[in-house]
From Swiss-Prot:
Catalyzes heptose transfer to the lipopolysaccharide core. It transfers the first L-glycero-D-manno-heptose to the phosphorylated 3-deoxy-alpha-D-manno-octulosonic acid (Kdo-P) of the inner core. It comes from the Bacteria. It comes from Haemophilus influenzae (strain ATCC 51907 / DSM 11121 / KW20 / Rd). This is Lipopolysaccharide core heptosyltransferase OpsX. The lineage of its organism: Bacteria, Pseudomonadati, Pseudomonadota, Gammaproteobacteria, Pasteurellales. Its EC number is 2.-.-.-. InterPro entries: Glyco_trans_9, LPS_LOS_Heptosyltrfase.
């Protein structure tokens, strides 16, 4: 029996970060909106991620900056002090999110099921979803919608990207040939692939007359990595590292033919735009974290390393098992990456 048999008047979504997970959450939010169009929706989201979601219709977005500490928590509580929700969907297990939830008034506070709940989230909720059979994060999020009475459906996304964003992207696209976007950096250095690997792939793509574009955030580490990669290229690729905001990046991703990326936000943005993406994985199970509609395109060494570390297949390991080996991403070879590019018709 679902929690609601008719549309709730108001819902609050709590998912702060990161960009990829916010993309997953957006599919859930828009699915709920489609089924319950009269329900008033409020989403508490991270300050950075807000840049991707702004201007989406029929939802109130409240940004939270984790750098503000308790001051930010109290400010958020003050904004919501006169607001009462039918339910809070707490889609983030981080303790910080649970603390934020204390100041959100809702009859039902819904959290993850036993297998996916972490950092004591169960102490802050009064309802828990059923863990889905599928290990993917997005399916876990979709279980929140099902719990409140929204039938299952394939995820869809509609981001509010402006014509100015698309015009910005156009200046980097070569419309006379195919375009490859390489986003080489993850949020943690251990999840990055080899600089030499990216450079070799870029050189091979260039030999096949592909327009190669590099992107990254403005973070110093990421800018330095892109600089090192491009220094090994036998041509001059288009380098827009640190030069785009999230919406401009989304516009660019929507126009390229393929994205190559480790576990990162741009990989999941590609899924929202229907752009094929090759994800590179070693430390996290790609069946859980890879771009949702591109699981078949993954190049991964996770399974064999899980067998080495635990002596059993990943299907028998706890849901969020992260491997501990050193430099596992170095085991990813160039050949299977090129093989995926050929399979996807890049050349």
């Amino acid at each position: 029996m679902p929690l609601f048999t008719e549309a709730p008047k108001s819902l609050c979504i709590l998912r702060l970060s990161a960009v990829g997970d916010v993309c997953h959450a957006l599919a859930v939010v828009q699915h709920i909106q489609e089924y319950y169009p009269q329900t008033e929706m409020t989403w508490i989201v991270g300050k950075t991620e807000m840049g991707l979601l702004s201007s989406i219709p029929n939802i109130t977005l409240i940004p939270y900056d984790k750098k503000t500490g308790w001051k930010g928590v109290l400010s958020l509580w003050k904004q919501l002090k006169n607001k009462q929700f039918d339910a809070l969907l707490n889609m983030q297990t981080a303790f910080r999110a649970s603390i934020l939830s204390l100041g959100i008034k809702a009859k039902f506070k819904i959290g993850f099921g036993e297998k996916r709940s972490r950092e004591g989230q169960w102490l802050f909720v009064n309802r828990r979803i059923r863990d889905p059979f599928s290990p993917h994060v997005l399916d876990g999020f979709m279980a929140f919608a099902e719990y409140i009475g929204v039938p299952k459906a394939e995820p869809k996304w509609e981001l509010a990207i402006s014509q100015d964003d698309y015009k910005f992207a156009d200046q980097f696209i070569d419309f006379s040939r195919k375009n490859l976007l390489i986003s080489p950096c993850s949020s943690k250095a251990e999840k990055d692939w080899l600089i030499e690997g990216y450079a070799e792939v870029a050189n091979i793509a260039h030999q096949h007359n592909i327009n190669v574009i590099f992107c990254s955030s403005p973070a110093k580490r990421e800018l330095e990595i892109v600089e090192k990669i491009t220094a090994l290229c036998h041509f001059t690729p288009t380098n827009i590292a640190g030069k785009t905001n999230l919406k401009q990046l989304t516009a660019l991703i929507s126009k390229v033919d393929l994205v190559l990326s480790p576990d990162s936000g741009p990989a999941h943005i590609a899924t929202t735009q229907g752009t094929p993406v090759i994800g590179l994985y070693a430390y996290h199970n790609p069946l859980r974290t890879a771009p949702y509609n591109n699981l078949d395109n993954v190049v991964s060494v996770y399974e064999e390393n899980a067998q080495k570390e635990f002596g059993k297949p990943s299907s028998e390991l706890p849901w969020a098992t992260k491997l501990k080996g050193k430099n596992l991403m170095t085991e990813i070879q160039v050949e299977p990456v090129i093989g995926q590019m050929k399979k996807l018709g890049l050349f």
